[in-house]
UniProtKB/Swiss-Prot annotation:
One of its GO terms (biological process) is regulation of DNA-templated transcription. Residues 176-232, 236-292 form the CBS domain. GO terms for molecular function: DNA binding. InterPro entries: CBS_dom, CBS_dom_sf, Diverse_CBS-Domain, UCP005063_CBS, WH-like_DNA-bd_sf, WH_DNA-bd_sf, WHTH_HrcA_DNA-bd. This is Uncharacterized protein MJ1232. It comes from Methanocaldococcus jannaschii (strain ATCC 43067 / DSM 2661 / JAL-1 / JCM 10045 / NBRC 100440) (Methanococcus jannaschii).
Length: 296
């Protein structure tokens, strides 16, 4: 879509003001910001409305609001704008994104409500719809709720919060187990089981000549309990899944789920083992139990 320089300038300022004030913006406010004649702004707004880039809100508190098409016309999403989605009936609602989340009645004994400010058409949603908001970018916050109100003018969904979850924005290298015990591939399962019992661990990397060659767990030993004197190299898992120390625990969970594993070996820039992180470690962190050596 080809816009004139003036149209792009006005549209960008409308978006800036709308983000700042979160309400319909009057033409006089845009004129004041751009040092332009209000009549010029009014004429250009008519053209922008015809292009479906701007919606007009009537009434004393009315004004102009940008449509989702306006953001695309200015290439804002293509420049890396973070999209926080909304899902309804398990499907992502296209053309709608969350720009602000507010919690109220948090001290109420029997309920908690939230105001979900969006960009896009609120008419995609109806009272009683069950929705999922998120995850947000930074802390991967996900909110599940039931819509109990809708403000079409200010583009707000009022929901009864059914549940909230969050995955802290923490590097695996900051919370992983740093005291790593490794196993030689020529050790027997009996020797490995003894080490696991002494060190209170349930798995370990297998290292040969400083090279990571596999991983062995209590589950592997249990499956071979009738052959307890087998060598580790005969039963270890060879497709070792690693994660860089600077990756986040959210990324670790995704890798674990994708590869159906319960632990990852943490490595540094030189692919040297610097720790281990398990699914249990992550669940403890999500529940608020951080390791004693945690630091950021």
């Amino acid at each position: 879509m080809e816009l004139t320089v003036v149209q792009r300038e006005i549209l960008q300022e409308l978006i800036n003001l709308y983000r700042e004030k979160n309400r319909p913006i009057k033409g006089t406010e845009i004129a004041l910001r751009l040092n332009r004649n209000p009549g010029t702004i009014r004429n250009q707004m008519q053209a922008l409305r015809a292009l479906d880039l701007v919606d007009g809100v009537p009434g004393p508190k009315g004004g102009y609001v940008p449509t989702s098409k306006a953001y695309r016309a200015l290439g804002l999403e293509d420049e890396g704008e973070i999209i926080v989605p909304i899902y309804k009936d398990g499907k992502k609602v296209e053309g709608v994104k969350v720009v602000k989340i507010e919690f109220d009645t948090v001290s109420h004994e029997k309920c908690c409500s939230s105001k979900i400010h969006i960009e896009g058409d609120t008419k995609h949603f109806n009272i009683g719809d069950i929705i999922r908001v998120g995850p947000t970018y930074h802390n991967k916050i996900i909110i599940n709720g039931k819509i109990i109100g809708r403000d079409d003018i200010h583009r707000i969904l009022l929901i009864d919060v059914l549940g909230v979850s969050s995955i802290p924005n923490i590097k695996v290298g900051d919370v992983g187990i740093k005291e790593v015990w490794t196993i030689n591939p020529n050790c027997t399962l009996r020797e490995t089981a003894k080490l696991f019992a002494e060190k209170y661990i349930s798995g370990a990397p297998v290292v040969d000549n400083d090279k990571l060659v596999g991983v062995i767990s209590l589950h592997d030993i249990a499956e071979n309990i009738d052959n307890i004197d087998k060598k580790v190299k005969e039963v270890m898992r060879r497709d070792v899944i690693t994660i860089h120390k600077d990756e986040k625990i959210y990324d670790a969970l995704k890798i674990m789920n994708k590869n159906n594993v319960g632990r990852l070996v943490i490595v540094d820039d030189n692919n040297k083992i610097v720790g281990i992180i398990t699914r249990t470690d992550i669940l403890k962190i999500i529940s608020g139990k951080f390791p004693e050596n945690f630091h950021t």
